[in-house]
């Protein structure tokens, strides 16, 4: 080490990053995590996240989750904090993926895995009916991802499973979500939050 050089622990290094998220429930409640300053990054607001997990339930014990455009990891880590059995965080950006791995290590989150790659491809790689919830929060500029992501999620989810989708106000993609039932909808500024459910066989339309 050079004279005057200070070596930061991973936790201290994360605290120097320009942005932070705060987990709001579960075993890591109130934990703050540093996030790299990446253009276009748009963490799900605390109020929206709190509403989402009120919809899903506070205890996700045994659930299997996939966060396809993880970004800050706020959605998937929140699920893990509330007891999800397994959470796969998928992120293409190298800096964000590295930060997610630091979060996983700092929290000793054994249920969390981080994959640097394409979220839609990761969904296609899941066994049919193997997931309980899929989080879809792609960049608003990437609206072309909604249709393939929803289609891939429909195959990966169990009947009765959930898809959470964040989109901007211009998204009018009801045909893209035709295989789901819209359970909840929330508007918060530019964010339109949708909670879809994959119908049970008895609920499917003829």
Language model features with spans:
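Class I S-adenosyl-L-methionine-dependent methyltransferase catalytic core
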Residues: 1-206
């Amino acid at each position: 080490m050079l004279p005057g050089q200070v070596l930061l622990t991973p936790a201290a290094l994360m605290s120097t990053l320009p942005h932070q998220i705060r987990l709001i429930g579960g075993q890591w409640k109130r934990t703050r995590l540093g996030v790299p300053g990446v253009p276009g990054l748009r963490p799900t607001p605390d109020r929206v996240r709190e509403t989402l997990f009120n919809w899903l339930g506070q205890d996700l014990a045994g659930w299997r989750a996939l966060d396809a455009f993880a970004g800050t990891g706020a959605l998937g880590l929140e699920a893990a904090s509330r007891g999800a059995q397994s959470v796969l965080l998928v992120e293409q950006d190298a800096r964000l993926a590295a930060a997610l791995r630091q979060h996983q290590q700092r929290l000793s989150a054994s249920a969390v895995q981080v994959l640097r790659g394409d979220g839609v491809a990761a969904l296609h790689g899941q066994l049919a009916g193997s997931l309980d919830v899929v989080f879809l929060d792609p960049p608003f500029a990437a609206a072309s991802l909604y249709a393939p992501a929803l289609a891939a999620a429909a195959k990966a989810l169990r009947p009765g499973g959930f898809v959470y989708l964040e989109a901007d106000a211009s998204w009018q993609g009801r045909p893209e979500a035709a295989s789901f039932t819209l359970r909840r909808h929330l508007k918060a500024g530019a964010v339109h939050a949708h909670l879809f459910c994959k119908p049970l066989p008895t609920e499917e339309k003829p």
